[in-house]
Amino acid sequence: PATDTAIRKMIKETDGDHFEDMRSLDQELTFCETKKEFQKRNITLEQPQMKTLGIINQDGIYTNLALLLSDQCVHTIKTAVFEGKNQNIFKDRKEFTGSLFAQMEAVYDYIDFRNQTHSTFEKLYRIDNRDYPEVAVREALLNCLVHRDYGYSSSILISMYEDRLEFTSIGGLVTGVTLEDVMMGISVCRNKKLANVFYRLELIEAYGTGIQKIMNAYQDQFIKPEIKVSNNVFKIILPNTNAQAELREELQYHTHIQPEDEETQIMQMIDQEKRIQRKQVQERLGISQTTSGRILKQMVKKGLIMQRGRGKNTCYVKK
């Protein structure tokens, strides 16, 4: 037998109704945040424009699209930061409310604040890398806002782990569209009028480009973004680029496929400097703090070098 969700979906498809076109149950709506967003682009948002966009219907009644853009929007985004790679320990959690535009700005800032920057060194030059490419975060967030099924009350869920960032929204793919279609750039928009508003505000460039931008942001990375789809859920998983860089170094080290022998280079450094610190190894070899520390510890265990001092004063000398 069909589930309640499946029956509801079939009825919607048969009747041809769209959530954003239906009358909003709340007609006492204000649009402070949305008007600010329009003002940023020097676009007028008065009653004629509201009718054109579908915020007000032909009878002068606010639609559900109006509800989504209003300060009274009932749909929310829930975020959580977890310790490690599972959901056992919460580090932080927060729920964002208000207009979709208010949520968009606040959630992006929330993620951006926690999107750490790690530095590596290539010869004399420092290279800064954020955990998650900003364009990928932006497009994943916009995808959730524009494409989710607002006919359901479930919140968008954004979960940050040690090694990944997940965006989960209610509403699978539109009927007739496959995941393969999406990966090839095909997009059938569930909320056409909402997408049109975002398009007019230059938040999205064209329908169907978002997923490709996410993939392009990781084109030089070891692990790629992952998209999971069920009948009712769409999930985008962004790998932590700095976490995977350390994983890549681990794999290279243990399989001995490095272009140069780190231990030999470190011994040469000690011959020249007499004593060295971990940071010097990190900068000279262009590896992470974790990897440089591990190599030095292994060299101590092998009896190649000795460790002297503690904390910031720790240094390594030839045995």
Task: Please state what every model-predicted region is.
Residues 1-154, 160-162, 168-188, 210, ...:
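Active-site helix-to-loop segments that bind/position phosphate- or nucleotide-bearing substrates
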Residues 165-200, 244-259:
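Glycine-rich/acidic phosphate-handling loop/turn and adjacent ATP-lid/helix
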Residues 231-268:
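Conserved alpha/beta core segments of nucleic-acid transaction machinery
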Residues 260, 277, 310-319:
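Short, cationic-aromatic polyanion-contact patches
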Residues 272-284:
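Short acidic, hydrophobic short linear motifs in intrinsically disordered regions
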Residues 290:
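Key DNA-contact positions within bacterial/archaeal DNA-binding proteins
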Residues 296-297:
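Short, hydrophobic-biased segments on the C-terminal half of alpha helices
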Residues 300-308:
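A short, conserved structural fragment
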